[in-house]
Amino acid sequence: VLAYCPETQDKSKGTWQSNIGNLLAEITFELGNPVFQKRENKTIDVCLLNHGGIRAVIPKGDVTTRTAFEVMPFENSLIIVGLTGKEIKTLAEYIIKEKKPHPLYGMKIYIDKSTLKINKIEINNQPLDENRIYYVGTSDYLANGGDNMTFFKESKIKFDMEYKLRNMMIKKKKKVDT
């Protein structure tokens, strides 16, 4: 047993976000950032994973290594992709168009609910700067354009952290009981 889950974490509950997606994106950000800082002396700004990559719920109760393999059965590794602020806007437009609760951390998208147009984007509570490079933690699958995330594939700035996303979940659950 790695940890205890006080409530079921499920990707099907939520329109723009899900509790399991938020958890996985936050874990990826939290555990990937020190590795990126040590290797490249840079900081992850945003983490974006994909809704379809979450393959099971984390049920209320004991969380085991098997749970981690059921939730994340793929051998996805953490890739950090450098995107301009303009490309971040494209990323936000993709999320809105998809209408799926893709796991996201470090970014807020404010939209007009009637038109679904973007009013404002914040990265770590700061307004988006279209000329800046932002470092986005994601999976190797998405970095290569999976799920039609072509904004990642087109980037020339990529860092392979050689760190399995599932292993991050296991490590985090070993450290924190709930």
Where are these regions (language model features)?
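Acidic/histidine-rich, surface-exposed loop or edge segments in extracytoplasmic proteins
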Residues: L2-T15, E70, M149-K153
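Short intrinsically disordered, low-complexity coil segments enriched in acidic
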Residues: V1-Y4, K175-D177
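Feature captures C-terminal
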Residues: N22-T178
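A conserved active-site cap/scaffold subdomain adjacent to cofactor or substrate pockets
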Residues: K13, S18-L24
